[in-house]
Curated annotation (Swiss-Prot):
Presence of keyword Ion transport: no
Paired cysteines (S-S): none
Similarity comment text for this entry: Belongs to the RapZ-like family.
Binding site for ATP: G15, M16, S17, G18, A19, G20, K21, T22
Name this protein carries in UniProt: Nucleotide-binding protein STH186
Keywords associated with the record: ATP-binding, GTP-binding, Nucleotide-binding
Binding residues for GTP: D66, I67, R68, G69
């Protein structure tokens, strides 16, 4: 047996069907876990061993196990013993909810319970609860989602498995773009700065970009720009901690001008710097700067 990195964090996610296991795995993935769902228990030790040999490339692994595994499910206790034998510590996250809520969720989704193929949903739930009783007793964490919204579940998982705010699990991506080249489709926030004075109409500035000091000075010297930037940073400063608290992992802020070469580039750089100074992980992307084939006609209008 090869040496295994014992620092790897392994979380086994299981519990009642309909209690939120799939959603939990999705949120754990946002927190930096490598997630595998509906894995036969017999494969768990081998997978844990393989990921323990990645030399730190994967340090957080979450495995989803549920009753859909059918005849494989009884193997889980033996698999847990094997994982312990190879030196990988694990935690069991058991997702639960009241029978009443589980029945309602199944009826709302019109899905069939895996253990109630021909019978009532409640019969399947009660049978599953009996089968999982021993595993529930081994759980490190039990999360009851009876009264939880998806946002509540995200917050709870972030509290138990998240890291510091400054970690890469919350990241801000600031994108400059030109409206004439199309919108940024995955943007969470979009700001249109085409109302600002346009360097395109200053001959000496036209061939430059928003990364050139002369363009930055021109864009930022106007009172309207300064007022807008002050209000922009005020809004972003208000929003960021609320996005973190909600459990959002990636926030994309798009700033657009006509061609994506001058005004949006300048303001995207300044905003990214401002966000970075406040301790957040941030990157900046200038999607449309420059497009060599279009340089002769960039920013044709105000």
């Amino acid at each position: 047996m090869m040496d295994v990195d014992r620092s790897i964090r392994l979380v086994i996610v299981t519990g009642m069907s309909g209690a939120g296991k799939t959603q939990a795995l999705k949120y754990l993935e946002d927190l930096g876990f490598f997630c595998v769902d509906n894995l036969p228990p017999s494969l768990m030790p081998k997978l844990a061993e393989l990921f323990g040999q990645t030399e730190g490339k994967v340090s957080r692994l979450a495995l989803g196990i549920d009753i859909r595994g059918g005849r494989f499910f009884h193997e889980i206790l033996g698999a847990l013993r094997q994982i312990a034998e190879i030196g990988v510590a694990y935690q069991i996250l058991f997702m639960d909810a009241s029978d009443e809520v589980l029945v309602r969720r199944y009826k709302e989704t019109r899905r069939r319970h895996p253990l109630a193929a021909q019978g009532r949903v409640l019969d399947g739930i009660q049978r599953e609860r009996r089968l999982l009783q021993e595993l529930r007793g081994l759980a490190t964490f039990i999360i009851d989602t009876t009264h939880m919204t998806p946002a509540d579940l995200r917050k709870e998982l972030n509290r138990r498995f998240g890291q510091d705010r400054e970690s890469p699990h919350f990241h801000v991506n600031v994108v400059s773009f030109g409206f004439k080249h199309g919108a940024v489709l995955d943007a969470d926030l979009v700001f249109d700065v085409r109302f600002l004075p346009n360097p395109h109409y200053v001959p000496d500035l036209q061939p430059l970009t928003g990364e050139d000091p002369a363009v930055v000075e021109y864009v930022m010297k106007w009172n309207v720009t300064q007022q807008f930037y002050r209000r922009l940073t005020g809004l972003i400063g208000f929003l960021l901690p609320h996005y973190v608290a909600e459990g959002k992992s990636l926030l994309t802020i798009a700033i657009g001008c006509t061609g994506g070469k001058h005004r949006s580039v300048c303001l995207a750089n300044r905003l990214a710097h401002w966000i970075r100074e406040r301790g957040y992980s941030v990157s900046v992307e200038h999607r449309d700067m420059p497009r060599p084939a279009d340089r002769s006609d960039e920013e044709e209008q105000p």
